[in-house]
């Protein structure tokens, strides 16, 4: 009897799991960091669906959505003219600052817009040129498909137009890595390094310096004082979103969802 009861319970559990509708959310690794938290909380409260988050980069997420391979896309940059067509619904769920980070031992406390521009263009190559030690600057950036990189370059004017397409215009010798965590790892281990990461990813392994004398924090971002800021976007096809995906989006924009976003270090779109 005990074996029969256990078998029955296992069968019921498996059936319930199979019946749960999966909602796939794909895109920006920066947005995925907070989306993982939102999805976990949502999944705990809703047994009839399961939200799966995949951090693969903004461009890849937008592409998957257009191909119908994901339910919801995530982007940490604005969509390009080519990407933003009438079939997509695009909306912000939060705002995030791009923090400029250096090694903990670096005495530099602030960088101006012009200085940061020149560092990434390769015009400023030594820390002594901005009040630091006589050391060559190791410049770290993100991969070409990164929404974080696209936002950073757009905000600083580090782009140019070729054949009607906006492309990167930074120094090609800058070190390219593929995640916020990798930027932090390199900056933490290299006393000469500088990089940029999502403000919500800043931890004690690196030092975030001020930009134009303003600290990257939720208050300064919400008040518009910190100028290296960008939206976290969700997107879906207007005429092709199922009830489970729509329900999760409403949760993200709900009071509970927005509070989780704020608790995780980002600026919510709703208070």
Where are these regions (language model features)?
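Bacterial N-terminal signal peptides
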Residues: 3-14
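Exported/periplasmic ABC-transporter solute-binding proteins
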Residues: 20-271
């Amino acid at each position: 009897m005990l074996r029969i009861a256990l078998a029955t319970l296992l069968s019921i559990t498996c059936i319930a799991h199979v019946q749960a509708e999966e909602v796939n959310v794909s895109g920006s690794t920066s947005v995925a960091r907070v989306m993982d938290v939102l999805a976990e909380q949502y999944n705990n409260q809703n047994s009839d669906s399961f939200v799966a988050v995949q951090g693969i980069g903004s461009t890849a997420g937008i592409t998957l959505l257009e191909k119908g391979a994901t339910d919801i896309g995530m982007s940490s940059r604005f969509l390009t003219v080519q990407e933003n067509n009438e079939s997509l619904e695009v909306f912000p769920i939060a705002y995030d600052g791009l923090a400029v980070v250096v090694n903990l031992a670096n005495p530099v406390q602030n960088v101006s817009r012009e200085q940061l521009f020149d560092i990434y263009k390769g015009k400023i190559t030594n820390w002594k040129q901005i009040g630091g030690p006589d050391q060559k600057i190791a410049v770290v950036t993100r991969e070409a498909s990164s929404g974080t990189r696209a936002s950073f370059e757009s905000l600083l004017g580090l782009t140019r137009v070729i054949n009607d397409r906006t492309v990167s215009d930074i120094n090609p010798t800058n070190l390219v890595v593929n995640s916020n965590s990798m930027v932090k790892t390199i900056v933490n281990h290299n006393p000469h390094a500088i990089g940029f990461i999502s403000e919500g990813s800043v931890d004690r392994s690196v030092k975030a310096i001020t930009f134009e004398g303003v600290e990257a924090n939720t208050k300064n971002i919400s008040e518009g004082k910190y100028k290296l800021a960008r939206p976290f976007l969700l997107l879906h096809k207007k005429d092709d979103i199922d009830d489970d995906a729509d329900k999760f989006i409403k949760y993200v924009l709900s009071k509970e969802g927005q509070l989780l976003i704020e608790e995780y270090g980002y600026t919510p779109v709703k208070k």
